[in-house]
């Protein structure tokens, strides 16, 4: 609409959060009751059906409705009071819960911190190397707990180890048999408890 009329200035986003209050003729921080009373009066005064010969009445009525809708919704009103119409635009684009995050990340100190970290890491090149290339091409990777570079056991060696372990276990027969249990047998025996595994 503003593009068709060359002399009309495009409406800009405010950060003060006062324009909607001015539309209703209220001061910033007015109560909900004051907003409702003023809205009713202005809506009746500027309703298009009451002013059929005034072409600006419909536009004024839309502005009054918009101001009332935003100022009676507490979430939108808090955003508007804090960030102005720019805050409402951000809430519409990214969601009401992300408005604070957006303004925090677009602050001068967040941008400065982002640039400084970028410069210190060589345009984030070191961060990429740490995550993708195992810490500076492997120079800073954690030391292995096993001696030697790589620990590899071939399947044949593993089978041979299992066979020798089984042969050694054959030399020591099981000498302790389980006791017979019934419903009166206690799971924990009486007397001092010993937690060591040696018999």
Curated annotation (Swiss-Prot):
GO cellular component assignments: cytoplasm; membrane
Record-listed Phosphoserine modification sites: 14, 16
Topology within the bilayer: Lipid-anchor
Localization per Swiss-Prot or TrEMBL: Membrane
Keywords noted in UniProt: Chaperone, Lipoprotein, Membrane, Palmitate, Phosphoprotein
Signal peptide start and end residues: none
Listed InterPro entries: DnaJ_C_subfamily_member5, DnaJ_domain, J_dom_sf
Tagged with keyword Lipoprotein: yes
Matching Pfam families: DnaJ
Principal place of residence: membrane
Domain J: from-to ranges: 19-84
Presence of keyword Cytoplasm: no
Modifications the protein undergoes after translation, according to the UniProt entry: Palmitoylated.
Gene3D superfamilies documented for this protein: DnaJ domain
Highest taxon of source: Eukaryota
Quaternary structure annotation from Swiss-Prot or TrEMBL: Interacts with the chaperone complex consisting of HSC70 and SGTA.
Protein name (record): DnaJ homolog subfamily C member 5B
Taxonomic lineage from the root: Eukaryota, Metazoa, Chordata, Craniata, Vertebrata
């Amino acid at each position: 609409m503003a593009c068709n009329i060359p002399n009309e200035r495009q409406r800009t986003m405010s950060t003060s959060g006062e324009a909607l209050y001015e539309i209703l003729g209220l001061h910033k921080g007015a109560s909900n009751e004051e907003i409702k009373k003023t809205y009713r009066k202005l809506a009746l005064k500027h309703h298009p059906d009451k002013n059929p010969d005034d072409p600006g009445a419909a536009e004024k009525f839309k502005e009054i409705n918009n101001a009332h809708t935003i100022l009676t919704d507490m979430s939108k009103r808090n955003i508007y009071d804090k960030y102005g119409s720019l805050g409402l635009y951000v809430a519409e684009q990214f969601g009401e819960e992300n408005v604070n995050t957006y303004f925090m990340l677009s602050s001068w100190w967040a941008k400065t911190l982002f640039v400084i970290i970028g410069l210190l890491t060589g345009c984030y090149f070191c961060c990429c190397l740490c995550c993708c290339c195992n810490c500076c091409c492997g120079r800073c990777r954690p030391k292995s707990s096993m001696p030697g570079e790589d620990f590899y056991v071939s399947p044949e060696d593993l089978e041979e180890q299992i066979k020798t372990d089984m042969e050694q276990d054959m030399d020591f027969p099981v000498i302790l048999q389980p006791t017979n249990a019934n419903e009166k047998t206690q799971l924990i025996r009486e007397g001092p408890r010993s937690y060591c595994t040696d018999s």
